[in-house]
Amino acid sequence: MDVDRDEVARRLGEDGFVVLDVRSDGEYRGETTAPCDPRPGRIAGAQHFDLQMLLALTPDEIRTRLGPPEDVELVAYCHSGSRSELATQILASLGYRAANYRGSWHEWSRDDSLPAETG
């Protein structure tokens, strides 16, 4: 399942709605960014869960980190929607309600009215 920018923006901060940034540490902190992105950083309030970590953890370790599947709705994003698609498939296989924000940071970073943070 995919969600769009407007839904992510509207639901930011909503209880049980968790935005997961599955990019690298440097991308998440805003220390590295693709040349095509006008600003570095992440969606404000996003939790970091690097795809490489997700691939390395056991299902129980993932559940410990994210909480019980019935308690959260997850939206994953990356730079362009590819890594987050894989993350979404993994999370859905574990019973999570997981959606992919396909526009990801490539889209979000272009709209200065959308909240972003670095560090």
What function would you assign to each model-found segment?
Residues 1-18, 22-75, 79-119:
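Rhodanese-like catalytic fold shared by cysteine-dependent sulfurtransferases
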